[in-house]
Regions:
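Positively charged n-region of N-terminal signal peptides that target proteins for export
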Residues: 1-4
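Extracytoplasmic copper-binding redox domains, predominantly the cupredoxin/blue-copper superfamily
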Residues: 19-258
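Acidic/proline-rich low-complexity IDRs
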Residues: 6-8, 55
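Hydrophobic h-region of N-terminal signal peptides that target proteins for export
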Residues: 8-18
Length: 258
């Protein structure tokens, strides 16, 4: 019994040290580059009857994950409305330049992006990176997770992650909607978008986005949201922008026609 207790204390101390050693990596929302150029801002809204997100009741069946939530369990995050669900804006929508940059080359950011596992959820639910940029996966929980990424243009991977562990991956091909899950906790889901230019953003808690540093030119701006319940009208917008010019573009999603 004495040996067993010592082993438990050693394991607990190891978990604490691992969590303390985990590097603090900024959650990135690139939104363009810090150079002179045009700026596009906007907001993504939802029009129509708002569906209600379902509670992740499966969490209650896992002792560790349940104790992460003292009150109400979290809800599915395949769609999230702004201001904690109290308004008509949409969070976690990818906004990006889809045409107009052909032939141009951009260096990936040196600073890594982060996809964290915390409270038995992926945070953020949507992360966007450039081709060649480092994406760090971190397990901030005191339980075992794994990262299982389903890809088409990049090599897939399925890696176990102990508490406090950080792994790095670099995607070498553009690819949208890479679904990332945890095999041990099936409700855990995130999406990774990989783009070949830095002019993209994921809408914030108020549904807003900013694309900055755009060279003068004509562009097509597209939006992407993961659920099949919604569709944008339209899905793209064309804009012509001059040096140091600012323009505003809003997008609207609505329930998908049956």
């Amino acid at each position: 019994m004495k040996t067993y207790c010592i082993l438990l204390l050693f394991m607990a101390a190891s978990i604490v040290r691992a969590q303390e050693a985990a590097p603090k990596v900024a959650l990135l929302n690139i939104g363009g580059i810090d150079k002179p150029g045009g700026t596009i801002t906007g907001i993504v809204r939802f029009k129509g009857a708002k569906p209600e997100a379902k509670t992740l009741t499966d969490i209650a069946g896992n002792a560790y994950c349940k104790q992460c939530y003292k009150g109400e369990l979290p809800k599915h995050d395949d769609f999230v409305f702004g201001k904690n669900g109290n308004d008509d804006t949409l969070v976690n929508v990818l906004v990006y330049v889809s045409k107009g940059l052909e032939g141009k080359k951009f260096d990936p950011p040196k600073e890594p992006a982060l996809l964290d596992q915390a409270g038995c959820m992926y945070t953020p639910h949507v992360v966007a990176v450039m081709v060649g940029q480092t994406l760090k996966f971190r397990n901030s929980d005191s339980t075992l997770h794994n990262v299982m990424a389903t890809t088409w243009s990049n090599p897939p991977f399925n890696l176990g992650m102990s508490s406090g562990q950080v792994i790095e991956r670099v995607f070498h091909q553009p690819e949208l909607k890479i679904n990332t899950r945890c095999f041990m906790h099936p409700w855990m889901s995130a999406y990774i978008h990989v783009l070949d230019n830095p002019f993209f953003a994921v809408t914030q808690a108020d549904g807003t986005f900013t694309l900055k540093g755009l060279p003068p030119g004509e562009y097509e701006i597209s939006v992407l949201q993961e659920t099949s319940l919604f569709e944008p009208a339209p899905a793209t917008a064309k804009v012509k922008i001059q040096a140091n010019e600012s323009k505003k573009i809003d997008f609207v999603f609505a329930p998908k026609a049956k």
